């Protein structure tokens, strides 16, 4: 093959990966190429290529088929991580610079894109052909050989293999054959190529890529950029909210390292934070706006422009709003982005300006404890600042694993200091978690959903031993005894009489609780006495034990313990509940007033899709109206994976969303083709935090704000949700109101920051530009102690409850007259708990937990983190032995809702009778249905997505998620 033949072939391949229509025109005009492709060559119709050809092309190379991934970039082909814009990309760019090549930026692709590599080789050939002496020619020949060996050979072979595997098209297979011939693995051309059928291939210079170099000569070398440091911060729903330094060069991310944050704050990232670039700069990114062309869930789309995406959304919104009213519109729960300019705020503001939308209350994280806390204290803010833990004499971490979940960037360091001081730390959890290993003096395993029984028995013991704080109970609470009851509630329904069996005939002794919880009675007595005697003592719950079918009652039981012992509102104590701390005000994107008054529990959105018009205040605890007037017909699902992956009973949700007569439009944005995005009608490829400026608030606790500075430009054709809603708001004539009269996103963010700073001068926020350089730490902040004012001055500061006191017994709950919502705290067995007769069929309990390698579903695509912490089912040796299972076996976990096939870890770090599976793995269904009768209509998940097995059984009061209350069986595959 001579150099002109190679140049011609490389020009053809450049055109193929750049503009396929131009390529086909070239082929059609060159007899040799036309002969090679023969009848397989696509034919033009009305000046365009056939739609089926263009769809097939986009499926292979543009990401419109969710099941096809071909790595098209040297960085992804030459590493195990599949990262974009890494050191490999930088090497490619610097090679371009050395020889004066100006990369084209083909369709938003990174510079090491396969088409760009082919074009660079064309450029080098053109430079060689332009050279007048052999020495100069050899420079460019050597450069081409070295570049090919270092980058293009592997990239081309990987791409050719991907084409051959994913496509049956003879035309595409011949393209793959041409690539294999040009870049043979063993040095010999593959048979049946254009070089065999058309030796001496050549065509006119104007069809050769970079042919202008023949006249102009090589471009001068370009200077290399020096590396620089960008300070930024993560914005997903992570308990850490850390600060990181990004080393960038030539638009490539070379490293992420710890940044202590503004003013020396300890905001160091964990392994997740240091791997952000490996998560987000992944070749499987969504690349272009798309509209669904197949059935929902099939993952088949067609590429569209931003204008077409806005057109589609505008048309669907107008059509559905006109037909069903604003109550058919809904912004789904999702917190993949929690920064100031997060997309859910943008969407809510837009909808509120155009008629309103159905709203939601609560969160999947804590809705049940939120309800319990609000009814008991009249406020959600029941937590103390982490620093106050240093004042406690005794700590119970109840269903709490801050070593993994972080729970505020300061929490882990404070707990480490507390342990070093010698303060006793107890952890109550079905699992021997990371926090047990790192912090606990004692691990108390407990059967899931029985925490309320343990709380009852501890309260009974404390009262029986005379360790209760009677002054606190009488002064600040109602409901502990008959003499202190809220108005309208019979005196006999007090908590004391419940504990002592006067109400139901069952005394809540430790022996009673042992049979329910699996916790020995002596252990219950010991920790009850220790907790009550150690004042100040802190009972610090996590959120896992309230994500059960009886989660509200569990939370109320733990609150009752803190009040019984007088540990509320004092340094070193703790009020339990949902635990949020009101430290400093935080900026937010104002959604404005929603003209539509209907509000549902965040967990009930699928019910609102199915039968929203039947949902009522009494039955479904909707707010704002007595009965909804519409089903959900339009969903914005933005930066969230709750549409499928994180909602209970995935197979039920899939079936519901596949019925397009129910929800008629789903417009969604994300960085990846997540399981939820596969069910979208409109797909918007969003930029990651590494590509966009923003402002980040701390997670739950924190005296600071963090700047989020873009490290690189948005990859591919990423669409900022702000730009999308800007265009949409212009279509509906509300842009000025929506944007606060700001012309663009950057100025809007600055406006919101400066408005917030002006509203809160005591925070001492710096000018915007200086803030974006380093962020800001607030000065002189005192630790927040929940309800300290009410405890110090009860006559001046009253609780925001009907009685003005802590309502251990609630008149509001009594008025509901629902046996599943008692007026007093107390253990209630729940569906699929350990006492459910269904255990005869599905004998094992299954809980989820937060793994250290993921933040919900974020990072599940990160190969490095998966290697560090693979997805496994935890099962106790006793349960494994009964089923012939050994460590590392692939097992099937199943119940009537579905099945999962995954490897197991046989470990005594889980209670007998209980299994555990980390939440957040991306739902990946098998293409086959399981053998046998169990769940035969549903394909098994192959990645360990726990919500295949969780049930849609809303809790009685909050109508929240019970996703840690599941019964399953496990068998060896």
Regions found by a protein language model. Give the residues of each.
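Glycine/threonine-rich phosphate-binding loop and adjacent beta-strand/alpha-helix elements that clamp
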Residues: 386, 690-714, 724-725, 729-731, ...
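Phosphate/diphosphate-binding loops
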Residues: 233, 429, 655, 661-665, ...
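N-terminal leader/propeptide and maturation segments of large enzyme subunits in energy/redox metabolism
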Residues: 292-308, 465-521, 711-809, 846, ...
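N-terminal export/assembly segments and adjacent metallocofactor-ligating motifs
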Residues: 199-467, 493, 498, 638, ...
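Active-site phosphate/pyrophosphate-binding segments
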Residues: 458, 483-613
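Surface/interface-facing alpha-helical segments and adjacent flexible terminal/loop regions used
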Residues: 1-205
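Extended redox/cofactor-interaction regions of prokaryotic respiratory oxidoreductases
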Residues: 344-423, 427-428, 453, 515, ...
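Long, contiguous, secondary-structure-rich segments that constitute the structural scaffold
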Residues: 208, 721-771, 857-859, 863-873, ...
């Amino acid at each position: 093959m001579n150099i002109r033949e190679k140049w011609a072939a490389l020009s053809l391949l450049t055109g193929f990966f750049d503009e396929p229509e131009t390529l086909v025109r070239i082929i059609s005009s060159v007899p040799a190429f036309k002969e090679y492709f023969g009848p397989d060559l696509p034919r033009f119709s009305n000046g365009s290529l056939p739609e089926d050809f263009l769809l097939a092309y986009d499926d292979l190379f543009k990401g419109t088929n969710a099941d096809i991934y071909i790595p098209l970039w040297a960085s992804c082909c030459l590493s195990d991580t599949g990262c974009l814009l890494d050191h490999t990309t930088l090497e490619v760019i610097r090679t371009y610079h050395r020889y004066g090549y100006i990369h084209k930026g083909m369709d938003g692709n990174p510079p090491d894109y396969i088409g760009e590599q082919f074009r660079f080789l064309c450029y080098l050939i053109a430079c060689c052909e332009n050279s007048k002496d052999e020495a100069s020619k050899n420079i460019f020949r050597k450069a081409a050989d070295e570049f090919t060996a270092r980058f293009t050979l592997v990239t081309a072979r990987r791409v050719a293999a991907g084409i051959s595997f994913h496509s049956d098209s003879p035309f595409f297979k011949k393209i793959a054959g041409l690539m294999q011939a040009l870049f043979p693995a063993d040095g010999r051309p593959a048979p049946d190529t254009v070089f065999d059928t058309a030796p001496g291939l050549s065509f006119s210079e104007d069809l050769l890529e970079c042919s202008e170099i023949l006249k102009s000569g090589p471009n001068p070398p370009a200077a290399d950029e020096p590396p620089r440091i960008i300070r930024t911060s993560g914005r997903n729903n992570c308990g850490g909210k850390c600060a990181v330094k990004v080393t960038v060069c030539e638009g490539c991310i070379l490293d992420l390292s710890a940044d202590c944050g503004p003013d020396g704050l300890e905001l160091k990232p964990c392994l997740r934070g240091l791997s952000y670039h490996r998560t987000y700069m992944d070749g499987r990114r969504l690349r272009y706006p798309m509209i669904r062309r197949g059935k929902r869930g099939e993952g088949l789309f067609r590429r569209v422009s931003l204008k077409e995406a806005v057109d589609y959304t505008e048309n669907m919104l107008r059509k559905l709003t006109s037909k069903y009213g604003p109550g058919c519109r809904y912004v789904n729960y999702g917190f993949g982005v929690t920064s100031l300019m997060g997309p859910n705020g943008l969407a809510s503001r837009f909808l509120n300006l155009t008629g309103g939308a159905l709203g939601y209350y609560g969160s999947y994280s804590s809705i049940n404890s939120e309800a319990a806390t609000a009814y008991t204290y009249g406020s959600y803010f029941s937590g103390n600042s982490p620093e106050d833990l240093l004042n406690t004499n005794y700590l119970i971490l109840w269903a709490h694993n801050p070593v993994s979940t972080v729970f505020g960037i300061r929490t882990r360091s404070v707990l480490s200091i507390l342990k070093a001081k010698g303060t006793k730390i107890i952890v109550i959890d079905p699992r021997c978690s990371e926090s047990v290993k790192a912090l606990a003096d004692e691990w108390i395993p407990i059967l899931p959903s029985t925490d309320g029984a343990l709380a009852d028995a501890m309260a009974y013991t404390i009262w029986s031993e005379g360790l209760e704080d009677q002054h606190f109970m009488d002064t600040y609470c109602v409901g502990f005894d008959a003499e202190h009851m809220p108005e309208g509630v019979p005196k006999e329904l007090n908590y004391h009489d419940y504990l002592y069996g006067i109400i139901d005939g069952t005394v809540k002794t430790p022996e009673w609780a042992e049979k329910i919880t699996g916790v020995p009675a002596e252990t219950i007595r010991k920790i009850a006495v220790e907790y009550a005697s150690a004042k100040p003592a802190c009972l610090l719950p996590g959120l896992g034990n309230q994500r059960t079918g009886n989660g509200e009652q569990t939370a109320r039981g733990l609150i009752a313990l803190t009040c019984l012992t007088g540990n509320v509102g004092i340094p070193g104590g703790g009020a339990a509940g949902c635990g949020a701390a009101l430290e400093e005000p935080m900026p937010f994107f104002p959604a404005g007033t929603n003209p539509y008054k209907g509000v549902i529990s965040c967990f009930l959105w699928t019910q609102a899709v199915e039968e929203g018009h039947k949902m009522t205040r009494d039955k479904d605890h909707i707010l704002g109206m007595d009965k909804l007037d519409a089903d959900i017909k339009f969903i914005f699902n933005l930066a969230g994976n709750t549409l499928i992956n994180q909602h209970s009973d995935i197979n039920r949700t899939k079936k519901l969303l596949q019925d397009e007569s129910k929800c008629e439009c789903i417009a969604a944005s994300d960085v990846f083709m997540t399981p939820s995005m596969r069910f979208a009608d409109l797909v918007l490829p969003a930029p990651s935090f590494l590509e966009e400026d923003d402002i980040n608030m701390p997670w739950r606790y924190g005296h600071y704000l963090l700047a989020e500075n873009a490290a690189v430009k948005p990859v591919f054709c990423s669409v900022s949700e702000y730009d999308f809603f800007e265009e949409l708001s212009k279509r509906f004539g509300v842009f000025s109101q929506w944007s606060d009269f700001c012309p663009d996103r950057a100025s809007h963010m600055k406006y919101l920051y400066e408005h917030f700073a002006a509203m809160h001068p005591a925070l001492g926020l710096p000018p915007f530009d200086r803030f974006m350089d380093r962020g800001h730490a607030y000065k002189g902040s005192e630790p927040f102690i929940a309800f300290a004012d009410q405890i110090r001055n009860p006559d001046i500061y009253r609780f925001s409850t009907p009685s003005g006191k802590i309502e251990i017994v609630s008149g509001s709950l009594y008025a509901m007259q629902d046996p599943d919502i008692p007026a007093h705290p107390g253990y209630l067995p729940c569906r699929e708990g350990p006492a459910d007769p269904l255990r005869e069929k599905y004998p094992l309990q299954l809980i989820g937990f937060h793994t250290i390698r993921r933040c919900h579903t974020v990072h599940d695509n990160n190969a490095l983190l998966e290697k560090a912490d693979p997805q496994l089912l935890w099962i106790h040796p006793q349960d494994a032995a009964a089923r012939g299972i050994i460590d590392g076996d692939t097992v099937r976990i199943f119940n009537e809702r579905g099945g999962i096939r995954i490897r197991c870890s046989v470990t005594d770090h889980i209670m007998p009778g209980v299994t555990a599976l980390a939440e957040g793995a991306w739902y990946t269904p098998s293409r086959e249905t399981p053998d046998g009768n169990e769940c035969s209509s549903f394909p098994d998940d192959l990645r360990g997505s726990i919500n295949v097995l969780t049930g849609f059984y809303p809790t009685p009061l909050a109508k929240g998620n019970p996703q840690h209350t599941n019964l399953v069986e496990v068998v060896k595959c």
